[in-house]
Design a protein with these regions (language model features):
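Membrane-embedded helix-loop-helix hairpins and adjacent transmembrane boundary segments
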Residues: 2-574
Length: 574
């Protein structure tokens, strides 16, 4: 079966407008994947009778299954397309979002925060806020989270459609509807249980498919040193291959960011906000069978997270070394008919994959997009059903009614996500869109949750007004810069800051606003009595000890191991 290429120019090979045509073996591989996904949904429908079954997979997942699902829920288009694009745009600096922007927060979730989430038996993060602060905080966070999840789901739809357009020449609208219908069917049937099993399957496929690009690309460039040499030749004016060395100035690195923005904005705020309060990922850990499994799951996920740059960031760096002409922002690409940063991964896929391998590679991408869509849609269904519908509209319905509502809400979430897919096209790259959303909703939420867990004096009024002030301040700062670009120097501390740097600093300021308002209001309003804080706050929760367990079975032991590996990697790529 022939592979059709229409030339533009791709370094030693051409960049085509229509990149590849599927051979029969490729179609068979993709069709088998779709059949397996739908089959899992139909099979697991029999095990989703109650609300706990549908929304939390019956709380029966082992640490390994919950841990891999915890990571796979985040290994969708945001990782595959978005961070490959970010690596092309910013170089190895994009790796910060996997290491300092993930590992410490995941370990903190497992060791410090998971006991409160799990012991309180909440269905969601907004559910925890209801128990800790009351109904107003729950509704505010639920509405914000529901809004964010459908916007995030749109990223996956847009990215999958982009791959089908670039790699296969398929119509973008057709691709969106095929993926949407498939996700709606299997999540409606099996709920979170179906989503988790498919996420583990998709995790394996993603690694099998995406790793091919990294291995073959390094062979072509002559290994890591050969790739670095080619990048320096293609981009002599910038340093794209060091993690920390160029972070002492806003102007010495491609991102236009100072190390304080990475350490404080990303490492201390956005990463902790996302990995400890975003219900999309926390929901997977809540499905663990016991507290030890729930604590181990994020730690297992952190171990794998450290390796993800080798299948996500590396293709973007290989694109810097190999692709010509240079890629550009989405708006410029649309205007000129060129290729954007967002297309670096499908371009690399087109460069290396023939029949069979192409089917595996495309299936890996489809798996990643559908994993991200399913994660957001299932989380949206849970938050809507428990934190909005049950809390405000129909409080005393049967369990079966809430399961039915969850299924209908899944369909609604998919339909709304289709509309949001087209919003992504207005941003320079996928990751600029994602990080803007995180700075709006995730950074302030982390301030509220962590104060609520660790400070008994934190009052219901303080939690609500702090969360609201943090969210509105972030949106306000974003609007200020859009209306007056000169304001960037006040938000990001430099007029040279790029979009990603602005997102980091905006997240930091919104978190500070949230914490200050929460503390100030709490000090002048009445806190809850300690009798109402049992299992919700440090000092009021009886957390089972682990002294009777062998060292290798203790979550803390593995957290230390992962933490040491994290430090070593940062030193190696300094």
């Amino acid at each position: 079966m022939s592979i059709h290429l229409i030339a533009l120019s791709l370094g030693d090979a051409p960049i085509p407008t229509r990149l590849l045509a599927l051979a029969p073996v490729d179609m068979i591989i993709i069709a088998l994947y779709f059949a397996m996904v739908l089959g899992i949904g139909f099979y697991l429908k029999r095990y989703t009778k109650t609300g706990d079954d549908f929304f939390l997979a019956g709380r029966e997942m082992t640490a390994w299954v919950a841990g891999l699902s915890f990571l796979a829920a985040n290994l969708g288009a945001l990782e595959l397309m978005g961070w490959a694009a970010a690596a092309y745009q910013y170089g190895i600096l994009a790796t910060h979002w996997y290491w300092i922007g993930a590992i410490p927060a995941m370990l903190f979730l497992g060791i410090v925060m998971m006991p409160f989430y799990y012991i309180s038996k909440t269905h969601s993060v907004p559910g925890y806020l209801k128990l800790r602060f009351g109904e107003p905080s729950r509704v505010l966070s639920a509405v914000s989270f529901g809004f964010m999840t459908v916007l995030m789901s749109g990223i996956n739809m847009y990215s999958m459609a982009l791959v089908m357009k670039v790699v296969l020449g398929w119509d973008i609208n057709f691709s969106i509807w095929v993926s949407s219908i498939t996700v709606a069917v299997y999540v409606c049937l099996g709920g979170l249980l179906s989503a988790i099993f498919n996420e583990v399957l998709q995790f394996v496929l993603i690694w099998m498919g995406a790793l091919l690009i990294s291995i073959i690309g390094l062979i072509e460039t002559g290994g890591w040193s050969g790739m670095v040499a080619r990048i320096h030749t293609n981009f002599p004016g910038g340093d794209y291959t060091h993690l920390w060395r160029t972070m002492g100035s806003f102007t010495d690195n491609p991102m236009g960011i100072h190390w304080t923005g990475i350490v404080l904005g990303l490492g201390a705020v956005i990463s902790f906000g996302y990995w400890t309060t975003d219900f999309l990922v926390v929901q997977r850990v809540l499905a663990a069978k016991d507290l030890r499994a729930a604590k181990l799951a994020p730690i297992i996920g952190a171990g794998f997270k450290m390796m993800v740059p080798f299948i996500v960031i590396l293709p973007g760096l290989l694109g810097l070394a190999l692709l010509q002409p240079k890629l550009m922002g989405e708006a410029q690409a649309v205007a000129t008919g060129g290729h954007s940063y967002n297309e670096v991964l499908p371009l690399m896929l087109a460069r290396y994959c023939g029949p069979g391998l192409l089917g595996l590679g495309v299936t890996a991408l489809i798996a990643g997009f559908m994993s991200g869509m399913a994660g957001n849609v299932s989380a949206f269904a849970t938050v809507w059903t428990y934190d909005i519908y049950k809390a405000l509209i129909r409080k005393d319905a049967t369990d079966a009614h809430y399961v039915s509502m969850g299924r209908w809400c899944t369909i609604l979430g998919v339909l709304v996500s289709i509309g949001t897919a087209y919003l992504v096209m207005q941003f320079l790259s996928i990751m600029d869109y994602v990080q803007a959303l995180f700075s709006f909703f995730i950074a302030p939420l982390f301030g509220t949750v962590v104060l609520g867990m660790l400070w008994k004096r934190c009052s219901p009024a303080g939690g609500f007004w702090g969360l609201l002030a943090g969210t509105l301040s972030s949106i306000g700062m974003w609007a200020w810069v859009k209306l007056d670009p000169a304001a960037l120097k006040y938000i990001a501390l430099s007029s040279n800051a790029r979009d990603m740097a602005e997102n980091m600093y905006r997240a930091l300021w919104s978190w500070i606003v949230c914490v200050l308002v929460t503390v100030a209001v709490s000090l002048v309003t009445k806190p809850k009595p300690e009798s109402e804080l049992i299992n919700l706050v440090y000092g009021c929760t009886d957390i089972p000890g682990e002294g009777h367990l062998p060292m290798h079975q203790r979550p803390m032991f593995w957290a230390v191991v992962v933490g040491l590996c994290f430090v070593v990697l940062n030193v190696i790529f300094w």
